């Protein structure tokens, strides 16, 4: 598994602001015997997962080709050498099996300690989930052509891992509240966090930071999250269309966050964490980002007024799309990049080119050992997929 991160204060805040975003990722890698043979080798690991999950879907993505040699990290950029492992290894070459925990948080700048909130959130989430991801990977030895029963635990199901993510975010929420109470400050942050293991991503979120899948085989971008935000509520109510949402003047208002003023009891306080699970494929790049990527336009309010005054006509809609950052542009930047680190940097540059209104951060992950994208993949975008508790049991 390869990953890259990039984070930036944003052009508008460069001379006087601070970066209140925080990104954390922890990758567990294991090599054994002749190397990891993948999740689709004779159906081995997939069948193991189906059996242990009451026969839930054992879902099986174009290689980027020869990526250029990785450059040293600079200015808030990290790059874990995707030049070698970004492709699925040829038959016979040893490969490591990978799993990961990730968390991205965006501190609320309108409050006293957003930077502390985001730091606490990302570190707390990863601390709580580190053991979970190793346990999940350890319980599935079939990818190494190995059959072990006792003493290995049965691999956790999708619902178990989603619950673990939610519990980690709630734990982070309580830690931020404890900090706020001790410091006498308000501390809020949005969070996107998850576990990538067994060819699946189990994730949860609070607020308007986002997760996407960009798939090279189908040349598409799939939003995995829906914003917990005022503008999203207006969209769902039919009061705001997709173009207006790009530049809406209330784009900075969220309806859910971790942390608070410290008045809530840190021992019992909770937050509603939305969770989901999706399969990942060889051609996928998992992208996690703060809202600074998509809410970058410093003249958003003016563009919104022009669009509304023009009767929301298509000509003005095209102007808005051209000046805002759209999902299609994000897809194109990722697919045309030479490497994950190149993509991460290009996304930050894109947001700054459009105004750089806020702090922005990106995390991209790719696993070349995964199965290729099937011809008819399951629905993965937010609003189209089936909740884990509603999936029908399948016999493979």
Where are these regions (language model features)?
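PP2C/PPM-type serine/threonine phosphatase catalytic domain
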Residues: 1-396
């Amino acid at each position: 598994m390869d990953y890259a991160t990039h984070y930036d204060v944003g052009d508008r805040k460069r001379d006087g602001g601070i970066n209140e975003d925080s990104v954390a990722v922890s990758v567990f890698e294991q090599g054994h015997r002749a190397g990891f043979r993948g999740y689709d080798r004779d159906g081995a690991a997939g069948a193991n997962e189906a059996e242990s999950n009451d026969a839930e879907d054992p879902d099986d993505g174009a290689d980027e080709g020869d990526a250029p040699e990785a450059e040293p990290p600079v200015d808030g950029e990290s790059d874990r050498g995707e030049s070698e492992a970004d492709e699925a290894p040829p038959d016979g070459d040893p490969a490591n099996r990978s799993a990961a925990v990730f968390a991205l948080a965006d501190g609320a700048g309108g409050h006293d300690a957003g930077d502390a909130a985001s730091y606490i959130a990302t570190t707390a989430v990863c601390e709580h989930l580190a053991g979970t991801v190793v346990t999940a990977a350890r319980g599935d030895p079939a990818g190494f052509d190995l059959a072990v029963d006792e003493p290995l635990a049965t691999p956790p199901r999708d619902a178990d891992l989603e619950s673990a993510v939610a519990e980690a975010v709630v734990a982070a929420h309580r830690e931020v509240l404890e900090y706020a109470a001790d410091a006498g400050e308000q501390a809020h942050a949005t969070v996107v966090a998850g576990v990538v293991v067994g060819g699946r991503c189990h994730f949860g979120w609070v607020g308007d930071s986002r997760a996407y899948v960009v798939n090279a085989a189908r040349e598409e971008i799939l939003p995995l999250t829906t914003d917990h935000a005022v503008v999203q509520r207006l969209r769902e109510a039919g009061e705001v269309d997709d173009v207006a949402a790009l530049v809406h003047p209330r784009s900075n208002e969220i309806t859910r966050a971790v942390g608070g003023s410290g008045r809530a009891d840190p021992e019992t306080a909770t937050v509603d964490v939305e969770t989901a699970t999706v399969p990942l494929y060889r051609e996928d790049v998992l992208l996690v980002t703060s809202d600074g990527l998509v809410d970058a336009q410093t003249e958003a309010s003016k563009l919104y007024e022009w669009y509304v005054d023009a009767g929301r006509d298509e000509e003005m809609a095209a102007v808005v799309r051209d000046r805002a950052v759209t999902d299609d542009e994000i897809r194109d930047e990722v697919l045309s990049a030479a490497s994950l680190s190149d993509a991460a940097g290009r996304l930050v540059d894109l947001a700054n080119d459009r105004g750089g209104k806020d702090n922005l951060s990106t995390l991209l992950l790719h696993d070349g050992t995964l199965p290729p994208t099937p011809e008819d993949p399951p629905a993965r975008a937010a609003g189209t997929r089936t909740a884990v508790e509603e999936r029908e049991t399948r016999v493979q």
